[in-house]
Amino acid sequence: AIYGHDDPLNVIPDNVSSYPKWGELTLDVSSVNIIDIDNPPGCSVGADICVYEVEYTTIVDLNNNNGIANGGFHVTHERCCRNNSIENISDPGGTGMTYYAWIPPIFFNNTSPEFTNSPLPFICSGDTTTALNTATDVDGDELIFSYVTPLKGNFTAANPPQNINPSDYPETYSIPIAEVQYGPGYSYESPFGAGGYYSVVASNGLTTYYSNIQGKFVVGVLIKEYREVNGQILLYGVTTREVQLIVQNC
């Protein structure tokens, strides 16, 4: 669903605010491909493991809709639920996931940044791994990368169901979106637990992982897109990526 944002000076509020539904959209599957796994050195997986890349596309004609989108558009899709075996969040099998982006107002001409590579699916336990979660922007905007807590969403596990329809989304939606709850021993600062490490270089998205615990983990990356307009630095877009990593003995 798409929700209108009426305040161009406060795109991602510190306190929870509700925004009206601008409209609904249905995305069509445009391509399905098996991609090569770019594992770190010494990390191998069985021949029966496949990673699929699925692309969804649609065209939407955005408009201001009587002023409700003076501050842009929040695009969100929620899905239930996660793998029961994820180590670092509470009740993963009952926790949803949310795909989110913010598009600037219609009087801003903009192209969102595109990630240059697929996320790394596997890392080796007890070994430091670096990976690129970088992106390019055809407009030449400044991109600032950071790691964030993955998004749970504003629904419960049973609402929406797995086969959610666009019309199931409520007439108002809360921003910031609710985040996952970390399990005991894990946190935003330590998503891999005690002794683990996770960092993202703000200028280029270079990401470093380290975990001495094996299992499945989820982490998040956020891109904020800035542009100078008439001497002012303005936020022009927000893009998120969530990564599920399998930490294994190599």
Language-model features: locations:
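Long, compositionally biased, intrinsically disordered segments
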Residues: 1-250
